[in-house]
Amino acid sequence: MIAGSMVALVTPMDAQGRLDWDSLSKLVDFHLQEGTHAIVAVGTTGESATLDVNEHIEVIRRVVTQVAGRIPVIAGTGANSTREAVELTTNAKNAGADACLLVTPYYNKPTQEGLFQHFSHIANAVDIPQILYNVPGRTACDMLPETVARLSTVKNIVGIKEATGNLQRAKDILASVSSDFLVYSGDDATAVELMLLGGKGNISVTANVAPRAMSDLCAAAMRGDAQTARAIHEKLMPLNNTLFIESNPIPVKWALHEMGLMPDGIRLPLTWLSEACHEPLRQAMRQSGVLV
């Protein structure tokens, strides 16, 4: 079972937007040393929308090779074309990923039946564990609990990243699926409470810059130690909030640059963090113990 703190890894780039393989290697080592339980590569935070197919495969391949089986590697392979999602998922399997994360189709706004058929088709086409990903704030497509329940019985579909931040939604999903279906948080601000309800981990933006704290939080929440988990959560809350002061992954890439872990690169149409946001984020990093 893949569980715990799963970092939604950034994809390092130089100032011209070229992929920085040395920094990627440095980040993977950072997470292996700091107790991250799994790495999610080329997801939303990894700027999958602006990577070409060859870059997408190469990031997965390099992360898988460096991790060398020590922790699971989950590859983002979602697309708003079912055919493309099958291709990306096949590529990820061939590159050695342990599982795939598939966001709901964005922009074309399928019906619930369309979502069921989309994910079922991918699951039947590629034999690899697959995690659904619901984030309607970014996709304009909301997969309802009834659809999740239907999909939870499909072979190869093993869980969902629920990123609405709505704990009632998480409760509804948990109540409608079997106990072996994995429900993960995709919202750092509410992750601790979702895990205390029975969720199996957090696919986290904050873990990029505070991996040890997020690992400890997830471990405490999953063993039912609410007091410890909530105490860590309170310390991380300034960071959880400020890492979304502009669109993700703009702030988290700036924070990692501030920590000396990667250059100042991001791809258009995203732009580097505006100067007015620098000090609020720097202060949140200090409050959360990331900077001294």
Curated annotation (Swiss-Prot):
Site-annotated residues for Part of a proton relay during catalysis: T44, Y107
This enzyme's EC code(s): 4.3.3.7
Enzyme class: lyase
CC terms in the record's Gene Ontology section: cytosol
Superkingdom, natural source: Bacteria
CDD domains in UniProt: DHDPS
Catalyzed chemical reaction(s): L-aspartate 4-semialdehyde + pyruvate = (2S,4S)-4-hydroxy-2,3,4,5-tetrahydrodipicolinate + H2O + H(+)
Keywords: Amino-acid biosynthesis, Cytoplasm, Diaminopimelate biosynthesis, Lyase, Lysine biosynthesis, Schiff base
Localization, UniProt: Cytoplasm
KW Cytoplasm (keyword) present: yes
One example GO MF annotation: 4-hydroxy-tetrahydrodipicolinate synthase activity
Residues at which pyruvate binds: T45, I203
GO terms, biological process: diaminopimelate biosynthetic process; lysine biosynthetic process via diaminopimelate
Active site, UniProt feature: Y133, K161
Pfam families: DHDPS
Annotated pathway: Amino-acid biosynthesis; L-lysine biosynthesis via DAP pathway; (S)-tetrahydrodipicolinate from L-aspartate: step 3/4
Function: Catalyzes the condensation of (S)-aspartate-beta-semialdehyde [(S)-ASA] and pyruvate to 4-hydroxy-tetrahydrodipicolinate (HTPA).
NCBIfam families reported for this sequence: dapA (TIGR00674)
Similarity annotation: Belongs to the DapA family.
Quaternary structure and interacting proteins, as annotated: Homodimer.
The protein's name: 4-hydroxy-tetrahydrodipicolinate synthase
Protein's organism: Pseudomonas syringae pv. syringae (strain B728a)
Gene from which the chain derives: dapA
